[in-house]
């Protein structure tokens, strides 16, 4: 594990100089999605937690690309997207806590799952997270009440910060409903918080993530 100051420096340098896929540049135009909070229900609801320092509530590195890819796969009229915002501010320091995020952020994700369950009872829920957002989802999903957890059909985790600690899965959630995507060279997946350029490439894997999530929802 590295010091917070070094992590800040790494993220700043990589954000400024690291290669960014074209799809990620397009997604920067819109980094938020709040369908649930706007009262919109569709057959499939994607709830996503962005990575540290990303703006909006979805982020451009993995969140919005996954939302867009899932809409392309299933149809825009079939998919609602909701980012985890509010108390989850995607700050850097919570990465260094025992759960790699803080309880307020986990609770905010749980709030979104509860909203989807109560507001859209017939919807099939899928979820995702990137970087610190994977820890947010990990902490939330493993503690969901069974009646809500059973409606979460699939989860994708990009650059899973608890990949080593949790053995590549979310505790108390079916492993076959979870896809961990780790880019070659992403040391975060090896149990460190060392940020390499590979950690910024996950827009490239949005199609793969969407394929997995689509395979977990019924037609």
From Swiss-Prot:
Give the EC number(s) under which this enzyme is classified.
3.1.1.74
Q: Which residues are glycosylated?
A: 99
Lineage, top-rank taxon, reads Eukaryota
- What are the annotated disulfide bridges? 41-120, 67-81, 182-189
Check the record and name the InterPro entries matching this protein: AB_hydrolase_fold, Cutinase/axe, CUTINASE_1, CUTINASE_2, Cutinase_monf
> Which GO molecular-function terms appear in the entry?
cutinase activity
Give the range the annotation lists for the signal sequence: 1-17
**CC per GO annotation:** extracellular region
Query: Which locations, inside or outside the cell, does it occupy?
Result: Secreted
Which keywords describe this protein according to UniProt?
A: Disulfide bond, Glycoprotein, Hydrolase, Secreted, Serine esterase, Signal
Q: Which reaction does it catalyse?
A: cutin + H2O = cutin monomers
Please indicate if the UniProt record lists Cell division as a keyword. Answer: no
Q: What does this protein do?
A: Catalyzes the hydrolysis of complex carboxylic polyesters found in the cell wall of plants. Degrades cutin, a macromolecule that forms the structure of the plant cuticle.
Its name, as the record gives it, is: Probable cutinase 4
Organism, scientific name: Aspergillus terreus (strain NIH 2624 / FGSC A1156)
């Amino acid at each position: 594990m590295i010091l917070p100051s070094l992590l800040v420096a790494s993220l700043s340098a990589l954000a400024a100089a690291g290669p960014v896929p074209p799809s990620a540049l397009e997604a920067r135009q819109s980094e938020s999605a709040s369908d649930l909070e706007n009262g919109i229900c569709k057959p499939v609801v994607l709830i996503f937690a962005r990575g540290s320092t990303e703006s909006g509530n979805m982020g451009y590195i993995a969140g919005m690309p996954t939302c867009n890819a899932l809409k392309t796969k299933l149809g825009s009229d079939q998919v609602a997207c909701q980012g985890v915002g509010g108390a989850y501010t995607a700050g850097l320091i919570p990465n260094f806590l025992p759960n790699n995020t803080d309880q307020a952020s986990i609770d905010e994700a749980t709030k979104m799952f509860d909203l989807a369950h109560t507001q859209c009872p017939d919807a099939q829920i899928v979820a995702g997270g990137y970087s610190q957002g994977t820890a947010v989802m990990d902490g939330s999903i493993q503690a969901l009440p069974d009646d809500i957890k059973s409606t979460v059909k699939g989860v994708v985790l990009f650059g899973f910060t608890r990949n080593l600690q949790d053995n590549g899965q979310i505790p108390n959630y079916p492993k076959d409903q979870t896809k961990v995507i780790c880019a070659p060279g992403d040391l975060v997946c090896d149990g460190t918080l060392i940020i390499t350029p590979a950690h910024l490439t996950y827009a490239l894997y949005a199609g793969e993530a969407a394929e997995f999530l689509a395979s977990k929802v019924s037609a």
